[in-house]
């Protein structure tokens, strides 16, 4: 394992190690990528947990619809693998594929101010949820927001009118009372 990872401000969390698998030092991974096996396309991972940062190399991986199993270079013991439980798996954003106009990664949307058609600040996007039919934005109140309500807004063409990353804003068609 290498102790010189990429700069922390360039890293995006794409998964999390949550357990061990078997006796050969493999780890179970929850992937935040879609499809989940895309996480295995990144061969060098930066692991972060509570101020601890380390870099590891992926040797092999496999999985199903729920989780992945990964073999990391130099990790051959179950007890050593157990120590990695809880680490977030990060990669530099520069490794992400380019998107077309109008497409965004979730990390780009998190933190955007959400403004309705009347110009009212509803809050900021805290995180997104995958629901099956469409993604859902969890909008939490912030300084200057209309009220102190948490809102769940669908990430759909009907709801999202415009995204301005430079301004840090998203315009939505949404009734503030809903």
Curated annotation (Swiss-Prot):
InterPro entries: PRC_barrel-like_sf, PRC_RimM, RimM, RimM_N, RimM_N_sf, Transl_B-barrel_sf. Residues 101-178 form the PRC barrel domain. Keywords: Chaperone, Cytoplasm, Ribosome biogenesis, rRNA processing. Pfam families: PRC_RimM, RimM. Transmembrane segments: none annotated. One of its GO terms (molecular function) is ribosome binding. GO terms for biological process: ribosomal small subunit biogenesis; rRNA processing. It is found in: Cytoplasm. Binds ribosomal protein uS19. The PRC barrel domain binds ribosomal protein uS19. This is Ribosome maturation factor RimM.
């Amino acid at each position: 394992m290498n102790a010189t990872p990429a700069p922390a401000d360039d890293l995006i969390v794409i998964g999390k190690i949550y357990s061990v698998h078997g006796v050969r030092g493999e780890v179970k991974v929850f992937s935040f990528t879609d499809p989940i096996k895309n996480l295995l396309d990144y061969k060098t991972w930066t692991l972060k947990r509570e101020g601890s940062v380390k870099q590891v190399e992926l040797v092999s991986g496999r999985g199903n619809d729920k989780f992945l199993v990964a073999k990391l270079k130099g990790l051959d013991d179950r007890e050593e693998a157990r120590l990695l439980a809880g680490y977030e798996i990060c990669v530099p954003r520069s490794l992400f594929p380019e998107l077309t106009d109008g497409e965004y990664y979730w990390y780009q949307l998190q933190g955007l101010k959400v403004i309705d058609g009347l110009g009212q600040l509803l809050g900021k996007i805290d995180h997104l949820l995958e629901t099956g039919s469409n993604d859902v934005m969890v909008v939490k109140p912030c300084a200057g927001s209309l009220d102190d309500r948490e809102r769940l807004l669908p990430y759909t063409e009907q709801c999202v009118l415009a995204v301005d990353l430079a301004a840090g804003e998203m315009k939505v068609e949404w009734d503030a009372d809903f």
